[in-house]
UniProtKB/Swiss-Prot annotation:
PROSITE patterns: G_PROTEIN_RECEP_F1_2 (PS50262). Gene3D superfamilies: Rhodopsin 7-helix transmembrane proteins. It comes from Homo sapiens. One of its GO terms (cellular component) is membrane. It is found in: Membrane. Glycans are attached at N167, N175. It is a multi-pass membrane protein. Residues 31-55, 116-128, 209-235, 288-318 are cytoplasmic. This is Taste receptor type 2 member 7. Gustducin-coupled receptor implicated in the perception of bitter compounds in the oral cavity and the gastrointestinal tract. Signals through PLCB2 and the calcium-regulated cation channel TRPM5. Belongs to the G-protein coupled receptor T2R family. InterPro entries: GPCR_Rhodpsn_7TM (IPR017452), TAS2R (IPR007960). GO terms for molecular function: bitter taste receptor activity; G protein-coupled receptor activity; taste receptor activity. Several bitter taste receptors are expressed in a single taste receptor cell.
Length: 318
């Protein structure tokens, strides 16, 4: 029964992976083509491209871990290969979260309407420093990933190996204090960007409220470009926050799996939930970006035209 559930979850993970690769690859391809055409890249496109690349890597690492867990479980008993996978999973996980946080910060400074001198100074400087901020996210993610991977790897692999040798439901003997401190470190590391996104979300709501009040006093109406920009930014940020909560819970399931009777099943269940976040959020970003939305509509129109042409030719031959 457990094998059937694992196989079903693996097929589900493959479907989520395919959808996520399609959406994120589309974002990266459109922005890179525009970069080559104009020989420069806008800050928002740089953030979206970096986010798409990190999520493609994250999707690949998670799916690879799912395949190894179901098809080649004995690999978990070795240290070198799984340590590499754990490192890249932790690295791409933090990169995708921090890049999404950078996107929320960028929306706040470019769309928010505040008149504080510090805010205006940051609003003017954000395009100049965004590349350095992204580079800082990479350095920070590497700094977080190295020690965390070593501790989690040692605890989890020992547990899986012990279970396979003794065939008992509970035979893991690990340093729970060390494991708890490692989990706490990882959770706090992801809590910081979540709080920053949450702060950006509430400040954007405050900015939208002030803008609508100002439009009502001037009797110009509320449906202006600035209001629409606020709404699109809020949709992108709130979708990230909700999906991040689901991803965070799945991450807790995966990292705490050896406290459960079916360790492998718990891991792949958590990973199948985790794939929802990098897969679905890309399409929300596409719908919220004018250039990406128009490009996606063109692709859909061309695909439909090709399909209609083939149907017409088949009907004509008949």
């Amino acid at each position: 029964m457990a094998d059937k559930v694992q196989t079903t979850l693996l097929f589900l993970a493959v479907g989520e992976f395919s959808v996520g690769i399609l959406g994120n690859a589309f974002i990266g391809l459109v922005n890179c083509m525009d970069w080559v055409k104009k020989r420069k890249i806008a800050s928002i496109d740089l953030i979206l491209t970096s986010l798409a690349i990190s999520r493609i890597c994250l999707l690949c690492v998670i799916l690879l871990d799912c395949f190894i867990l179901v098809l080649y479980p004995d690999v978990y008993a070795t240290g070198k290969e799984m340590r590499i996978i754990d490192f890249f999973w932790t690295l791409t996980n933090h990169l995708s979260i921090w890049f999404a946080t950078c996107l929320s910060i960028y929306y706040f400074f470019k769309i928010g309407n505040f008149f504080h001198p510090l805010f205006l100074w940051m609003k003017w400087r954000i395009d100049r420093v965004i590349s350095w901020i992204l580079l800082g996210c990479v350095v920070l993610s590497v700094f977080i990933s190295l020690p965390a991977t070593e501790n989690l790897n040692a605890d989890f692999r020992f547990c899986v190996k012990a279970k396979r040798k003794t065939n008992l439901t509970w035979s893991c003997r690990v340093n729970k204090t060390q494991h708890a401190s490692t989990k706490l470190f990882l959770n706090l590391a992801t809590l910081l960007p979540f709080c920053v996104c949450l702060m950006s979300f509430f400040l954007l709501i405050l900015s939208l409220r002030r803008h609508i009040r100002r439009m009502q006093l001037s009797a110009t109406g509320c449906r202006d470009p600035s209001t629409e920009a606020h709404v699109r930014a809020l949709k992108a940020v709130i979708s990230f926050l909700l999906l991040f909560i689901a991803y965070y819970l799945s991450f807790l399931i995966a990292t705490s799996s050896y406290f459960m009777p079916e360790t492998e099943l718990a891991v792949i269940f958590g990973e199948s939930i985790a794939l929802i976040y990098p897969s679905s959020h890309s399409f929300i970003l596409i719908l919220g970006n004018n250039k990406l939305r128009h490009a996606s509509l063109k692709v859909i129109w061309k695909v439909m035209s090709i399909l209609k042409g083939r149907k017409f030719q088949q009907h004509k031959q008949i």
